[in-house]
């Protein structure tokens, strides 16, 4: 692994992106989002102004969630076209689009999805290497996007948590890149503080938020905790105490809930899986 190859970080949403039909569509240049389909054959031109004419389609597309489906397809079917398509769609964005393009939320999800999917591609037995120019361009774009995101962080709430986590993912995946150490030193302590604020042990002090948002945010903290374990980051005892209390509350069935399984996009499904991570030995605490 060279300095421009990302280290694999834990992805808590990997199991939600196993759509082979979607991966085939992306290979064919068909991008379906928010109920609309746009065909971009060959090398996608992300600078096309007409793409922005459908804001809902554009907002979903530029998060690059489908790169995880491409990686799953490549890992499962081992056909080169999935790797080639990933390089085309991601490489084109990295080469043609400014690092500050899009909302901070979209940017945070985009850098995570690029890194998660890249690492998954490399785990396939069929993987050889990315084209050097694509690898260099994507890494440079990731670092520049992360630096820009740091200047546009939300001031509070679940949006700030996810954006901080995106910075941590970049820092852990690309530790040898300039600025990564600073990102890690900034993002990880900030996530500690967010954990204590967003999920106090006294549930009466827990802020009022939508159940979906709260679950998504807790899933983010679980992923952050697992990556702290993987990469040996120091973890304060208070972080684990608040996290365990939040998990126990979240997994308790509510009176209005039924025994029906969660839909695949429900963050509680990911929470149930990620909660298993907490049964592993914790990293050294500071």
What are these model-predicted stretches?
Residues 182-193, 209-219:
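Alpha-helical membrane segments in multi-pass integral membrane proteins
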Residues 119, 162-175, 266-280:
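Long, charge-rich low-complexity segments
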Residues 194-203:
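Histidine-acidic residue clusters that define the catalytic metal-binding segment
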């Amino acid at each position: 692994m060279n300095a421009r190859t990302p280290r694999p970080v834990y992805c808590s949403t990997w199991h939600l992106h196993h759509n082979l039909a979607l991966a085939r569509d992306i290979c064919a240049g068909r991008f379906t989002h928010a109920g609309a389909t746009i065909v971009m054959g060959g090398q996608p031109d992300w600078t096309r102004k007409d793409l922005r004419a459908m804001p809902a389609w554009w907002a979903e597309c530029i998060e690059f969630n489908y790169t995880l489906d491409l990686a799953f397809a490549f890992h499962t079917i081992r056909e080169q076209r999935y790797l080639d398509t990933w390089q085309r769609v991601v490489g084109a964005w990295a080469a043609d689009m400014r690092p500050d393009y899009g909302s901070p939320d979209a940017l945070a999800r985009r850098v995570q999805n690029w890194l998660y999917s890249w690492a998954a591609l490399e785990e396939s037995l069929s993987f050889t290497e990315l084209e050097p120019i694509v690898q260099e361009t994507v890494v440079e774009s990731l670092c520049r996007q992360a630096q820009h995101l740091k200047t546009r962080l939300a001031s509070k709430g679940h949006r700030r948590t996810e954006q901080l986590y995106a910075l941590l993912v970049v820092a852990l995946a690309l530790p040898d890149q300039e600025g990564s150490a600073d990102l890690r030193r900034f993002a990880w302590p900030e996530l500690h503080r967010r954990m204590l604020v967003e999920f106090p042990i006294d549930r009466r002090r827990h802020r009022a938020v939508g159940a979906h948002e709260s679950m998504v945010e807790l899933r983010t903290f679980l992923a952050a905790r697992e990556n702290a374990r993987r990469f040996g980051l120091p973890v304060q005892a208070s972080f684990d105490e608040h996290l365990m209390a939040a998990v126990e509350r979240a997994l308790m069935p509510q009176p209005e809930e039924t025994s029906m399984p969660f839909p695949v996009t429900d963050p509680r499904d990911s929470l149930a899986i990620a909660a298993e991570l907490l049964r592993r030995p914790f990293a050294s605490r500071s």
